[in-house]
Amino acid sequence: LSNMGVVKNAVSGFLGVGDKTYTNAKGKSEFMSTAGLKAADVKSASYTLSGGKYTYTLVLNNGSSYADSANKKNNSPVDRSGILVGTGDKSAFDHKCAANLYTAINNTDGASVKSVRESSSNVKCVAVVNASNGRLERLTVSFDFAVTLTNTKYVVTIKNAGGSASTSVKYSGFKF
């Protein structure tokens, strides 16, 4: 059981727990993708104008994802907000769906997991736009998430393990 801290640290890393800063060169957007939100993903939307800046706020519906060896399902609006980039596990992902976690854990040094369930809630996207030139100045996506791992193996077998966290992803310093 002395290795349990290693398991916790590895899983926390896969989940994106912790502080990370990435810098893109002008004209690059490796850590953002095109948003694909649908009207049904949005719980509420509002905007304000103050000090020459528009602040747009979208509150998204809760979502979930699931992965095992045969199935990968994802109905998580946060993943359609533009912060889930690519497939597989990469530390640049700001939110990891169950499929990302399943692949990452099963490709880690001697570790395996039978299935992964992930859920997100309290998702809020806030964009600040300069009213005079229409340029995006700041984007923040905040959400709570919880993960349950079934039959996780790493030195020992853990029938069920889980955790939850709150996070905020902040983008700023856009270059045009």
What residues fall within each predicted segment?
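Subset-of-secretome marker
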Residues: L1-F176
